[in-house]
A protein has these predicted regions:
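Conserved CoA-thioester-binding segment of acyl-CoA-metabolizing enzymes
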Residues: 1-65, 100
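Terminal peptide-recognition signature
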Residues: 25, 29, 44, 62, ...
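Hydrophobic alpha-helical membrane-association signature
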Residues: 40-43, 91-94, 124, 197, ...
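Crotonase-fold acyl-CoA enzyme core
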Residues: 100-216, 243, 248, 253-256, ...
Length: 269
């Protein structure tokens, strides 16, 4: 029986850097290609939950340290012989909560996939609003080939990006594909050389941070929930969102800035 490894200090498994309203979160387990341990999920959970109390953050970039983004779940960090059903259930629920926090974050999230992204690691990236991926990165959702199952929401996030036919190919055949393929299929927004991924992701985050926060939040919410509504319900939801935006100071600022031919200064209210 393998003895469980001592827990990693939470402050070390996730790095934070905030600059000009952009919060960069770096998965920091490069010795394991950023495989996601329970400690890393816990830190992500707490940090993402704190965004509602950090009004200065206007966008988030999520990336990985070293040569990989994340190669998936790291249950070995806890000792293979020590895993029981209770631990597995807690781990899965925690992973699902983190993916939902990314999808429902109060600010947009850009995944900077700087290298390989597999399984739970790719699930994290798919939960983001936008994705920039290294052209040469290898991506895979291998669960059905391993006799396990995906649990991070890809049955929704993947077909929402690439359509049902391509999602079936990716999930049922469990093949590796490249970052260049991901961009060609619409899974990622851009494919760049690995050295350019973080800078390109930050550029997207800066563009997002310059948008009107209330309008941006309404757009993200509606895009996420639109597949569950009828066309008439979507029109009604858009009308309600439009009315809410019209009540904000940013609505007035946007119109004034347009007429004055200057960049708008939005305050999120």
């Amino acid at each position: 029986m393998t003895s469980p490894a001592p827990p990693e200090p939470e402050a070390e498994v996730l790095l934070e850097h905030e600059e000009d309203g952009i919060l960069t979160l770096t998965l920091n387990r490069p010795h394991r290609l950023n495989a996601v341990s329970q400690e890393l999920y816990l830190r992500l959970d707490r940090t993402l939950a704190s965004l509602r109390r950090r009004p200065g953050v206007r966008a988030v970039v999520l990336t990985g340290a070293g040569r990989g983004f994340s190669v998936g779940a790291d249950l070995k960090a806890h000792g293979e012989g020590e895993l029981d059903d209770t631990f597995r259930a807690r781990y899965i629920l925690l992973a699902q909560r983190v993916n939902l926090r990314i999808q429902r974050a109060p600010v947009p999230v850009v995944a900077a996939v700087n290298g390989h992204a597999v399984g739970a690691g790719l699930e994290l990236a798919l939960s983001a609003d936008l994705m920039v991926v290294a052209e040469e990165a290898k991506l895979r959702l291998p669960e059905v080939a391993l006799g396990t199952f995906f649990g991070g929401g890809v049955s929704y996030t993947l077909p929402a990006r690439v359509g049902l036919a391509r999602a079936r190919e990716i999930l049922l055949l469990a093949r590796f594909f490249s970052g260049a393929d991901a961009a060609a299929w619409g899974l990622a927004n851009e494919a760049r050389p690995a050295a350019q991924v973080l800078a390109a992701s930050r550029e997207l985050a800066e563009e997002l941070a310059a948008m009107a926060p209330v309008s941006l939040r309404q757009a993200r919410d509606l895009l996420r929930s639109a597949p569950h509504r009828s066309p008439a319900e979507n029109l009604r939801a858009e009308g309600e969102a439009l009315f809410r935006c019209m009540q904000t100071e940013d609505w007035k600022e946007g119109i004034e800035a347009f007429h004055d031919r200057r960049p708008p200064r939005y305050h999120g209210r």
